[in-house]
Amino acid sequence: MKNMPENHNPQANAWTAEFPPEMSYVVFAQIGIQSKSLDHAAEHLGMMKKSFDLRTGPKHVDRALHQGADGYQDSIFLAYWDEPETFKSWVADPEVQKWWSGKKIDENSPIGYWSEVTTIPIDHFETLHSGENYDNGVSHFVPIKHTEVHEYWGAMRDRMPVSASSDLESPLGLQLPEPIVRESFGKRLKVTAPDNICLIRTAQNWSKCGSGERETYIGLVEPTLIKANTFLRENASETGCISSKLVYEQTHDGEIVDKSCVIGYYLSMGHLERWTHDHPTHKAIYGTFYEMLKRHDFKTELALWHEVSVLQSKDIELIYVNCHPSTGFLPFFEVTEIQEPLLKSPSVRIQ
């Protein structure tokens, strides 16, 4: 471990994914329906939910709600497969093809569709869990093991095997391009990302907290998380943060539960590290969490976990159909209009 201090002895327990030798990839697909009123999205969401039950469907799927820009909401499914071929078979199924890539959305539809599909080599992936819980992301179908590779700067990088042989820097260097407001409504767009994009899903689960701890988390810790996410979203060029969504998780029927996660993309792992190491907004999260621990005698039922991956351009497929201009990767990088026109319709888009 390149960054681990000598004689390192963590003060708290932590766990990390232990991928079986026969497993080479994780497919993580975020699939979103965007609208100012999700009542318009009911048909699409119903088709999506039904398709997840197919034999080739995901090993696990979460649902979440994101309050986005200009009053838009995103209803998002976060789906995991343990091999790319099964995912490809699922996409090819007629039940999925009914809605995949926004095929049923017309040029004036009140809804947009987007998908961000990542095919992640196992050596480009790492996880960390505060408890021995098998209900977080890939841990639904991958064992987790106790680890001492945490509680020091650089531990995230050390847990990712490929970091032993690569610095994982962006070919674009330190500076994220300035965002561009593109004409995106009524269009089917594909974004080409550069190599070594860093993806993080970092999550909080307060469902098992008692009333006092829950009140402390919501009143003290969560506001700093919201502030940090807002800063990242509004300062992309400074931080290298391409996209950061704070989402609240739901049941598959759409009921909000006591879980949230931030899903962020950075120009490189180094950009994520610099924000976590140095920026006041991240230090504030640590500070309020430590204050919560002190208030509750350093005993907590709050469950924390994250998944981090570094992605090559060929392993990211980014599609946006009839979405607002600040959705996902749209403000950055190379954008191509897919030459499969949207349906024609006399309906009027709700803006």
Swiss-Prot record:
pH dependence: Optimum pH is 7.0.
Temperature dependence: Optimum temperature is 30 degrees Celsius.
A Pfam family: Dehydratase_hem
EC number per UniProt: 4.8.1.4
GO molecular function terms noted in the UniProt entry: metal ion binding; phenylacetaldoxime dehydratase activity
The entry's keywords: Heme, Iron, Lyase, Metal-binding
Reaction catalysed by this enzyme: (Z)-phenylacetaldehyde oxime = phenylacetonitrile + H2O
InterPro entries tied to this protein: OXD
Cofactors that this protein relies on: heme b
Assembly and binders: Monomer.
Free-text function comment from the UniProt entry: Catalyzes the stoichiometric dehydration of Z-phenylacetaldoxime to phenylacetonitrile. Prefers the Z-form of phenylacetaldoxime over its E-isomer.
The family this protein is said to belong to: Belongs to the heme-containing dehydratase family.
Protein's UniProt name: Phenylacetaldoxime dehydratase
